Structures are given as structure tokens and as C-alpha cells.
Amino acid sequence: MMKAWNFILLGLMVCSGIFAQPAENQIVITTNHPLVKIEKDIYGHFSEHLGRCIYDGIWVGEDSRIPNTRGIRNDIVKALKDIGIPNLRWPGGCFAETYHWKDGIGPKESRPAIVNTFWGGVTEDNSFGTHEFMDLVEMLGCDAFICGNLGSGTVQEMAEWVEYLTSDAKSPMTDLRKKNGRDEPWKVKYFGLGNENWACGGNMDPDFYYDQIKRYQTFTNLHGRNKIVNVACGPAGDDYNWTEVMMKPHGPRPYLPFDALGLHYYTFIQSVAVDNDEWGWFSTFRDNYN
């Protein structure tokens, strides 16, 4: 008898499921009351002297048969404008920690060459420098993110670069900028206080790096009306100790010597920076899409 009642109960449940009417649901979307704002600058891009990103990639020179504007490839400008990049970072990356900006200004035929020690050991002629990069940024209508050389450079070198870029006062650096063809200062939104200083930027520990950026930051905000966002080097992956040290004010003055922290996370492949073979390309795609 119990089995019969169980069968009847099961039948009633099945029938009720068949004849039940679906409930009407409504979704209300209020477009004028956003909950959060996604900062556009997290979608910024990076241009480093790595492989053919700069030479042959962005820069081909004024005499190239590839269509260009003042040496910068027109197709690259169009592609980057089409995706609407908010900011562009240059010259690195690890390359920034060997780059001395004064070698990349003035007449191109007078610029000294540089050996790209981090990426392939190739020799570059420095024909793409500060003026060329800022020209590119203005073509794109995006913000400039300059990365300074904290690893092998000096405080004075970095401070003079900021002055050259942004100052409107009468000074040796602004006179030099005008001599090189740019009367008005540029607008620079972001300035990196080194790059990956736990590795290629000097193999520093976080306490030492923190002390270094206190000196550098002191002298990079002194010029013109351009308020620069100083970006410090963040951790390698999940190195929480680096972050803890960076976010804790040191010494008698309780302030952080930076405005933002750069984060670094990579998918590594066993390949080379230039002249990648077919396997290198497929490995890159596979590791980044998995």
C-alpha cells in the first residue's frame, strides 16, 4: 500500500510540474546610476624597445617606402586610434633602465647608438627618442607614460628629463627643447620611477628601492604646471612583502613618495625576443589563451 501511495504522490508532482505556469520576470537596467567606474587607464598600452616593436614596428623613418608621418607608421597610428588606447608607456620595460634620454634628442645623425643589452643585444641608432614618442602620443590623442631610468641613471638625469618635457620656465633644459624644435612643453600624465627594480632595474630589495624613490620623487615634481602621477615599481607577481614595504610610510615624514603602484604579472615562454620561429609564436598564443 505504501508503494501505491508513493507512486500516486510522484504522479501528482510530475503533473503539477507539467501544468505549472512560468512566472514573469523583469530585469530593470538603470544606465544613469552606475555602481562603479572602471578606470580607463587600466587599458593602457606599452611600447618597449623589444623585438621590432619600435624599430620597423612603430618607427620606420621619414625616408621609408612604408606610408608614414614624420617617420611614424600611419597604419600603426590608425590601429591604435581605432582601439582608443588611453595611455602609452615608453621606453620600457627593462630597456628603460639602460636608456639615457639625452642620447635620443637633437639631429638624428648626431645621436649616439645604444646596444640593447636586455633584448637581443642589437644596436639601435636612437632615431626614435623623446620628440618622436611625444609626437606619436599627440597623434594618438592619448596620455604619455614616461618610464625613468632609476637603475643605471641619476637623480639629476631624471629631473632634467621631466624639466625638458614639462617646464615652461626659462632654463637650460627648456632652451635645449626649443633648440630641438619644440617651443611649448608637453603634457606628461605618468612618470615611472624605474621598472622592475627587483630584477632588471637593479636587483633591489624593497627597502632599498623605497629609499631610492624618495630621492628621485623629490626632484621630479618641481617643473611647470604639469602635475605628474609618479608610478612606483610594484611587486613581482604575488610578492606581498614588496607591497607591504611600499605601502608603509618610512621615516619621520609620514607620506608615500609615489602616487600609484605598477603591477607585474607574466606568462613565460621558452623563446627569444627577436626572430621568433613558428613554435615560438604558437607557444605564446597557447600560453596566453589557456
Label the model's feature ranges.
Residues 256-268, 274-289:
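Extended catalytic-interface subdomain
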Residues 20-244, 248-260, 286-290:
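Non-catalytic accessory regions flanking glycosidase/transglycosidase catalytic cores in CAZymes
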Residues 15-17:
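N-terminal signal peptide c-region/cleavage motif recognized by signal peptidases
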Residues 3-10:
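Sec-dependent signal peptide recognition
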